[in-house]
């Protein structure tokens, strides 16, 4: 494990990284929000179905 090489790699990546534009940030936020909503909706649907089954929650 070459620590110096690893640190140089991390520094190189950080130098290439840039702040996203507002449009890019907005698009990523919308997609992430939609994903969170869908996962929550799926969990709610599973909970609702399990509540109606005999021996459910």
Curated annotation (Swiss-Prot):
Span-the-membrane segments of this chain are 33-53
Instruction: Identify the keywords attached in UniProt to this record, alphabetized.
Output: Cell membrane, Membrane, Protein transport, Translocation, Transmembrane, Transmembrane helix, Transport
Q: Any idea which GO molecular function terms this record carries?
A: protein transmembrane transporter activity
Q: Which GO terms describe its cellular component?
A: plasma membrane
Where is it localised?
Answer: Cell membrane
Primary localization class, coarse: membrane
Q: Which GO terms describe its biological process?
A: intracellular protein transmembrane transport; protein secretion; protein targeting
How is the protein disposed in the membrane?
Single-pass membrane protein
Q: Which InterPro entries match?
A: Prot_translocase_SecE_dom_sf (IPR023391), Translocase_Sec61-g (IPR008158), Translocase_SecE/Sec61-g (IPR001901)
- The residue stretches assigned to a coiled coil in this entry are none
Assembly, in brief, is:
Component of the Sec protein translocase complex. Heterotrimer consisting of SecY (alpha), SecG (beta) and SecE (gamma) subunits. The heterotrimers can form oligomers, although 1 heterotrimer is thought to be able to translocate proteins. Interacts with the ribosome. May interact with SecDF, and other proteins may be involved.
Give the family this protein belongs to, as stated in its UniProt record.
Belongs to the SecE/SEC61-gamma family.
Its biological purpose: Essential subunit of the Sec protein translocation channel SecYEG. Clamps together the 2 halves of SecY. May contact the channel plug during translocation.
Per its UniProt record, what NCBIfam families does this chain match?
Answer: PRK09400.1-6, secE_euk_arch
The protein's name: Protein translocase subunit SecE
What lineage is this protein's organism placed in?
Archaea, Methanobacteriati, Methanobacteriota, Stenosarchaea group, Halobacteria
């Amino acid at each position: 494990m070459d620590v110096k090489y690893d640190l140089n790699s991390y520094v190189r990546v950080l130098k290439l990284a840039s702040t996203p534009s507002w449009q890019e940030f907005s698009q990523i936020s919308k997609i992430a929000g939609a994903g969170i909503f869908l996962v929550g909706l799926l969990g709610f649907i599973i909970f609702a179905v399990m509540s109606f089954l005999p021996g459910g929650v």
